[in-house]
Amino acid sequence: MLSIINLTSKTIKEVNKGVDLVIGFFDGIHKGHAKLFKQSDRFNLLTFDHIPKKQRLLYPKVDEIEQLSALSGLEQLLVYDLLNNNLSAQEFIDNYIKLIQPKRIIVGSDFKFGSDQVDYSLFAKNGYEVVVVKKDHCSTSEIKKLIINCDLDQANKLLLTPFYLKGTVIKNAQRGRTIGFVTANIILDNQLIELTEGSYVCKVIVDNKTYQGICFIGKPKTFDEKQRQCEAHIFDFDQDIYGKKIKVELYQFIRPTVKFNSINELKEAIENDKKAALSFFHKQEKPKVVVALSGGVDSAVCAYLLQQQGYDVVAAFMQNWDKDLNFELLSDHADDQIQGCDAKQDYEDTQKLCEQLKIKLYHFNFVEQYWNDVFLKVLEDYKKGLTPNPDVLCNQFGKFGWFINALRKQFGDDIKIAFGHYAKLITKDDEVFLVHTKDHNKDQTYFLTMLKKEQLKNIIFPLSELDKPTVREIAKQANLYVANKKDSTGICFIGERNFKQFLSNYLAIKKGPIILIDENKKIGEHDGLYFYTIGQSRRLHVGGTKEKIFVCDKDYNNNTLYVCYESSKDQYLSSVSCELEKFNWLIDTKDQLFNKKLWIRFRHRQKLQECEIVSYHDDKVIVKYTKQIGVTPGQYGVIYDQNLWVVGGGKITKIIK
């Protein structure tokens, strides 16, 4: 516990010996003082009372002591009273410093002491190690000038806490109540700096609760009173606080004092003061944003950038998979080790990142919803012979479904929500549009194509103008906890798995023949049709063929996998048109897009291909394109206009060769 010692020849024996000693005049703790305190993690502090110079103070000595008492690392606070005891600098060293025996003496570069006002070099001449800290033009005298000249914004930037007045609320004539503006009045100490008389934007702290308000400082000329005081009108406040101590923080000067000719003039002026204060607070309030953190570097950089932009950032993490609850028995992590996306590790990384950035973290569990709305749909597509895309479903039903609904319920419908997707949103005529980003390799609009416009309301994509190398560099420069973490791969929210083992938990897997369609002969055995994708050429485990082979068809009725030679890909794998089912339009002018040159992508990172919409009916769209290899049913076709705004997308159901 901090001990406070009024330093005299008798009490000096109570001072701890051999610790650092910070010496200074601490009337209002500012950033220059903070530099002094950072020089040691264990120190005593020596300050002075009753400075001989006739100068007004920022705060009473009791407030100075209260502020200093909160310092980390401070062991003893020594107060030396200069009244009738102002020794020369050398006498002070001989009578006090030599008895204190400090390890080091820490002072500011402008420090002078003693009746002869000698600088800090005298300590060194007496054999003490002196640490001199430059305060960069941050001084109490400069802060006083700023406050007197009504530049409270700059003064508060230099102070560690906003400039304030304190006092006990007094009884008065209660004339404010008669005109609808109740005030809490405190008497101002005449020893403190004399503020410019007038109206100020303020905050009032009552019983450790903070309220917005306005205050008048001066001798109220309106009613011919002479006592200098602070009259604070607290917004939306009707408690009886007479006799209570309050703190009034000053933020902005509104207008000088004037004499009003009538009550109505006074009321109008106060109303205008209140409007000015409310406008000030509205501009000062940090907009709140929830960042969806995944444990990866992209979302971490989102949180960091939004903090740097002045947002009030909170974080949310959602768990969508539980290995035990979901009966995942057979699947080991890929390569027999945890890599990339692992729910437990990701949550731990997210917690450590939030501790580093000092932001609050909320945890949401959507294991049941993920199973029903995403995973069962994935299994259903596999059973139909399709190649599903879990990432599209994750965004459609998960991140921008149950997740944002839960966040809006928690924080309000207008809460801004940020994601680490490489995507861009443009608002035009109060409508939001999804747009391709500058990083063509990383762009993730493909995975967002099934989102409705209402799902994109108040969504922020902070990485929209950045590429991946830049994001990595930002993370490293900011020393973010996950800066060197690998990108996640594998199944959305499930992570790296031995895919064959994993899928075997939920689907009946049966081996069968691999038929080379060019020669109509069996060349091997597949491990189960679900494990293969149209156009796949790797991991077929078939050797001895004269050419590279590709998966070209899957016959679920006969459990047969068909492959073809590379030279016959055009015959078996090419297409010039396809049908997109449950097409989600993100641009309303679809009639104007009919038979117009557009762009399409059938898989993430694929180079954009020319196309045109040849017909649409209900939720089905037929699209024609330049010849493509490996367009796969179950995946999605995403269409862009000439400006790379997303027109919409749908699931590929039919291929037209």
Curated annotation (Swiss-Prot):
Pathway: Cofactor biosynthesis; FAD biosynthesis; FAD from FMN: step 1/1; Cofactor biosynthesis; FMN biosynthesis; FMN from riboflavin (ATP route): step 1/1. It holds the Pfam family tRNA_Me_trans. The keyword tRNA-binding applies. Disulfide bonds join C394-C492. InterPro entries: FAD_synthase, MnmA-like, MnmA-like_C, MnmA-like_central, MnmA-like_central_sf, Riboflavin_kinase_bac, Riboflavin_kinase_bac/euk, Riboflavin_kinase_dom_sf. Keywords: ATP-binding, Cytoplasm, Disulfide bond, FAD, Flavoprotein, FMN, Kinase, Multifunctional enzyme, Nucleotide-binding, Nucleotidyltransferase, RNA-binding, Transferase, tRNA processing, tRNA-binding. Residues 1-141 are annotated as: FMN adenylyltransferase. Residues 442-444 are annotated as: Interaction with tRNA. It catalyses: riboflavin + ATP = FMN + ADP + H(+); FMN + ATP + H(+) = FAD + diphosphate; S-sulfanyl-L-cysteinyl-[protein] + uridine(34) in tRNA + AH2 + ATP = 2-thiouridine(34) in tRNA + L-cysteinyl-[protein] + A + AMP + diphosphate + H(+). Residues 283-657 are annotated as: tRNA-specific 2-thiouridylase MnmA. The record marks H421, Q635 as: Interaction with tRNA. It comes from the Bacteria. In the N-terminal section; belongs to the RibF family. This is Trifunctional protein RibF/MnmA.
